[in-house]
Amino acid sequence: MYMFENLNNIQKLYGNVSVQIPNWTFKALTENIKSGANANVKQASFAYAYVVLVSFLYKYTQFVDLENETYIQNKDIKQILGYDPTTKTIDRVIKKDGILDKIGLTSTTKNYPVTFEHTAEEINGFPIREFTTINMLSVDDVNYSRYKKIVKNRNYTVKEPVFFFENEGDVGTLYNYNRTHTITLKEFISFTYNDELDNVDFYLYAFFKSKCHGMKFNECGIRQTTILSQIGMSTRTLYAHTEKLVKCKYIKVDYKGWKVESQEMLVPNIYTFFGVR
């Protein structure tokens, strides 16, 4: 349960909170995270979980946890998401100016958020979320010295979710939920701290949620070819991880099989999304 208390503090303070992730994230990760010419679903799914985690840490200003006197670095996030902290193969994804930064999902900054408040002004009916960052704190602030004492790495950087503030030429997902999907902290924790589930399971779960949740009966038809192209996994991997989600009762699948008149096109399977409860 590595660094579970940092995430649990968010729950204690704010309840079962959520973040909005752009639907274009799946295709962007699949197209940009490859091993040779092929998509690397293991690294893409890690990248997705990484984006979700830093979104929670940024939105609820928990990169530095005053209560636990800890701060979360990339090596910690690797460990939270099932990697050894010394693993180098995924650094190309999360480093400054790495893949996540280059495709515009994140940016790297030393100016991490420390508090937030809602203003009286609104965007699309949502109160504006005003962040205070470490550089905005006065040295006389009661917590300034506490932050500086906890953060021992002088080169400490965090990821800012760019899509929070601007997404597809519109206001960001803090204020515009169009073409996004919701991930709750409960969902994230249910996958991350379950030894029976991994990042690929979470990636596929989020994909099905993005397609089905909010539809009539939370149900939709999706061709297998669509999933394979957008998620970038083999048929065998898709079925293995889909069955894990079915076993957990997160989804139900009504398999339709192949069209008789066209062996190249699959009849859409019907997916029903139940989700973490």
What are these regions (language model features)?
Residues M1-K88, P113-C220:
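Short recognition helix of helix-turn-helix/winged-helix DNA-binding domains
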Residues Y58-E121, H213-V267:
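Winged helix-turn-helix DNA-binding recognition segment
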Residues E130-D140, V151, K252, V260-R277:
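C-terminal engagement modules used by replication, chromatin/transcription, nuclear envelope/ESCRT
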